[in-house]
């Protein structure tokens, strides 16, 4: 089966992603251009790597990039609610930087809420969040990202770094995955 056979529809085109990324980069540049601290983009692996790569190229102020690997899904399509830091930030002194966590999608809000607390506990002077996609209808904690590219409906989406079972990250657009691909019948998906 080819990738195109697994996609129900394209939710966000390559062109729209580019426009969203440019708009977010402009806002971030404007908000941080007068900061006395270095901006650090913290890429949450693996999902946000494509978004982070494109976003950082459009931000027109000096910045650094760090990565963390955090898991809350395991092999499921639904977050377990248990946030596991698999690879922590290697930087020791966080008091001299502005951290902007870059995430591909916010569902429950658990990951970014807990990651923000974790970084503040490690001594970060400022932590903000940026997500390409937001599903506020799935929120289980009180969390609003500081920067949001687009609010989307409660659909299972893949592409542009987002995956199902480690696949589909390579799609240049955001697509809705056919329910039969991830084991749901059409009736269960709705």
Would you name each region that the model predicts?
Residues 1-190:
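PRPP-associated nucleotide enzymes
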């Amino acid at each position: 089966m080819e990738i195109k056979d697994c996609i129900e529809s394209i939710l966000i085109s390559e062109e729209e992603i580019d426009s969203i990324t440019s708009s977010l980069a402009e806002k971030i540049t404007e908000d941080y251009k007068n900061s006395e601290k270095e901006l650090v983009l913290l890429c949450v692996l693996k999902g946000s790597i494509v978004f982070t790569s494109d976003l950082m190229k459009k931000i027109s102020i000096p910045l650094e990039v760090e990565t963390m690997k955090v898991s809350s899904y395991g092999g499921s399509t639904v977050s377990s609610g248990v946030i596991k830091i698999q690879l922590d930030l290697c930087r020791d002194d966080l008091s001299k930087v502005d951290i902007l966590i870059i995430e591909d999608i916010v569902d429950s809000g658990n990951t970014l809420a807990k990651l923000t607390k974790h970084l503040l506990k490690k001594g970060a002077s400022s932590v903000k969040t940026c997500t390409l996609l937001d599903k506020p209808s799935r929120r289980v904690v009180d969390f609003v990202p500081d920067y949001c590219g687009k609010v989307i409906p409660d659909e299972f989406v893949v592409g542009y770094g987002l995956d199902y079972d480690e696949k589909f990250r390579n799609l240049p657009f955001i697509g809705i995955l056919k329910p039969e691909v991830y084991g749901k019948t059409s009736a269960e998906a709705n």
